[in-house]
UniProtKB/Swiss-Prot annotation:
GO terms for biological process: meiotic cell cycle; negative regulation of protein localization to nucleolus. Component of the FEAR (CDC14 early anaphase release) network which promotes CDC14 release from the nucleolus during early anaphase and is required for the efficient segregation of telomeric and nucleolar regions. Although BNS1 can partially compensate for a lack of SPO12 function when overexpressed, it does not appear to play any role in controlling meiotic nuclear division. It comes from the Eukaryota. This is Protein BNS1. Keywords: Cell cycle.
Length: 137
Protein backbone atom coordinates (compact mmCIF):
# COMPACT_ATOMS: atom_id res chain seq x y z
CA UNK A 1 0.00 0.00 0.00
CA UNK A 2 1.35 3.28 -1.00
CA UNK A 3 -0.31 6.40 0.38
CA UNK A 4 1.99 9.07 -0.84
CA UNK A 5 3.13 11.95 1.26
CA UNK A 6 5.48 12.05 4.24
CA UNK A 7 3.66 9.50 6.42
CA UNK A 8 5.38 6.18 6.69
CA UNK A 9 3.74 2.78 6.37
CA UNK A 10 4.04 2.17 10.13
CA UNK A 11 2.09 5.27 11.04
CA UNK A 12 -0.68 4.42 8.57
CA UNK A 13 -1.11 0.88 9.92
CA UNK A 14 -1.15 2.19 13.48
CA UNK A 15 -3.90 4.63 12.55
CA UNK A 16 -5.91 1.88 10.84
CA UNK A 17 -5.60 -0.39 13.90
CA UNK A 18 -6.60 2.47 16.18
CA UNK A 19 -9.69 3.18 14.07
CA UNK A 20 -10.64 -0.51 14.04
CA UNK A 21 -10.20 -0.79 17.81
CA UNK A 22 -12.31 2.28 18.50
CA UNK A 23 -15.07 1.07 16.16
CA UNK A 24 -15.10 -2.34 17.87
CA UNK A 25 -15.20 -0.75 21.30
CA UNK A 26 -18.02 1.56 20.16
CA UNK A 27 -20.09 -1.39 18.96
CA UNK A 28 -19.49 -3.16 22.27
CA UNK A 29 -20.63 -0.07 24.12
CA UNK A 30 -23.71 0.10 21.89
CA UNK A 31 -24.51 -3.54 22.69
CA UNK A 32 -24.10 -2.85 26.39
CA UNK A 33 -26.29 0.24 26.12
CA UNK A 34 -28.91 -1.69 24.15
CA UNK A 35 -29.13 -4.40 26.80
CA UNK A 36 -29.24 -1.74 29.53
CA UNK A 37 -31.95 0.17 27.67
CA UNK A 38 -33.97 -3.00 27.17
CA UNK A 39 -33.66 -3.84 30.86
CA UNK A 40 -34.64 -0.28 31.75
CA UNK A 41 -37.65 -0.38 29.41
CA UNK A 42 -38.80 -3.69 30.86
CA UNK A 43 -38.48 -2.47 34.44
CA UNK A 44 -40.37 0.74 33.58
CA UNK A 45 -43.09 -1.31 31.90
CA UNK A 46 -43.43 -3.56 34.94
CA UNK A 47 -43.52 -0.52 37.24
CA UNK A 48 -46.18 1.12 35.05
CA UNK A 49 -48.28 -2.06 35.00
CA UNK A 50 -48.01 -2.34 38.78
CA UNK A 51 -48.99 1.30 39.20
CA UNK A 52 -51.93 0.91 36.81
CA UNK A 53 -53.05 -2.28 38.55
CA UNK A 54 -52.91 -0.60 41.97
CA UNK A 55 -54.84 2.37 40.60
CA UNK A 56 -57.58 0.12 39.19
CA UNK A 57 -57.78 -1.88 42.41
CA UNK A 58 -58.23 1.27 44.43
CA UNK A 59 -60.88 2.54 42.00
CA UNK A 60 -62.66 -0.81 42.19
CA UNK A 61 -62.62 -0.81 46.00
CA UNK A 62 -63.99 2.69 46.19
CA UNK A 63 -66.68 2.53 43.52
CA UNK A 64 -67.67 -1.13 43.20
CA UNK A 65 -69.51 -1.26 46.51
CA UNK A 66 -71.51 1.87 45.75
CA UNK A 67 -72.39 0.46 42.33
CA UNK A 68 -73.56 -2.79 43.90
CA UNK A 69 -75.61 -0.94 46.51
CA UNK A 70 -77.18 1.29 43.86
CA UNK A 71 -77.94 -1.72 41.68
CA UNK A 72 -79.53 -3.57 44.62
CA UNK A 73 -81.71 -0.56 45.47
CA UNK A 74 -82.87 -0.25 41.85
CA UNK A 75 -83.70 -3.96 41.68
CA UNK A 76 -85.63 -3.74 44.95
CA UNK A 77 -87.56 -0.71 43.69
CA UNK A 78 -88.46 -2.50 40.45
CA UNK A 79 -89.66 -5.56 42.37
CA UNK A 80 -91.83 -3.43 44.65
CA UNK A 81 -93.33 -1.59 41.68
CA UNK A 82 -94.23 -4.83 39.92
CA UNK A 83 -95.75 -6.22 43.12
CA UNK A 84 -97.83 -3.06 43.56
CA UNK A 85 -99.06 -3.25 39.97
CA UNK A 86 -100.04 -6.87 40.41
CA UNK A 87 -101.81 -6.26 43.74
CA UNK A 88 -103.72 -3.15 42.67
CA UNK A 89 -107.38 -3.77 42.14
CA UNK A 90 -109.88 -1.12 41.20
CA UNK A 91 -113.15 -0.92 43.17
CA UNK A 92 -115.17 -1.78 40.10
CA UNK A 93 -113.35 -5.08 39.52
CA UNK A 94 -115.73 -6.87 41.89
CA UNK A 95 -118.71 -5.54 39.96
CA UNK A 96 -117.50 -6.68 36.54
CA UNK A 97 -118.17 -10.11 35.18
CA UNK A 98 -115.25 -12.18 33.85
CA UNK A 99 -116.32 -11.42 30.31
CA UNK A 100 -116.34 -7.67 30.99
CA UNK A 101 -112.87 -7.90 32.51
CA UNK A 102 -111.57 -9.61 29.40
CA UNK A 103 -113.16 -6.95 27.21
CA UNK A 104 -111.63 -4.16 29.29
CA UNK A 105 -108.20 -5.79 29.12
CA UNK A 106 -108.53 -6.14 25.37
CA UNK A 107 -109.56 -2.48 24.98
CA UNK A 108 -106.66 -1.29 27.08
CA UNK A 109 -104.25 -3.33 24.95
CA UNK A 110 -105.69 -1.90 21.75
CA UNK A 111 -105.54 1.70 22.88
CA UNK A 112 -102.14 1.43 24.51
CA UNK A 113 -100.53 -0.15 21.44
CA UNK A 114 -98.84 2.26 19.07
CA UNK A 115 -100.44 2.26 15.68
CA UNK A 116 -99.60 3.97 12.44
CA UNK A 117 -102.70 5.55 10.95
CA UNK A 118 -103.30 5.14 7.26
CA UNK A 119 -103.04 8.27 5.18
CA UNK A 120 -106.14 9.20 3.32
CA UNK A 121 -105.47 10.53 -0.13
CA UNK A 122 -108.77 12.02 -1.19
CA UNK A 123 -107.13 14.81 -3.14
CA UNK A 124 -105.28 12.46 -5.46
CA UNK A 125 -108.32 10.32 -5.93
CA UNK A 126 -110.38 13.29 -7.13
CA UNK A 127 -107.66 14.41 -9.52
CA UNK A 128 -107.39 10.98 -11.12
CA UNK A 129 -111.11 10.73 -11.89
CA UNK A 130 -111.77 12.02 -15.43
CA UNK A 131 -114.43 14.70 -15.50
CA UNK A 132 -117.25 14.46 -17.99
CA UNK A 133 -119.37 17.45 -18.68
CA UNK A 134 -122.92 17.20 -17.38
CA UNK A 135 -125.25 16.82 -20.25
CA UNK A 136 -128.94 17.26 -19.55
CA UNK A 137 -131.19 15.42 -21.88
Amino acid sequence: MSYGGSASQDIVTKLIRKIQNTSVSCTRRDENLDSFNQHLKMSLKVAHNTKTFAKHCLHRQVFKNTYRKRKAVEDQRKNLNTQLRQKFASPSDNLLSPCSRKLNDHKSKLFSAKSQPKTLEFVRGKQNIPRKPNVDI
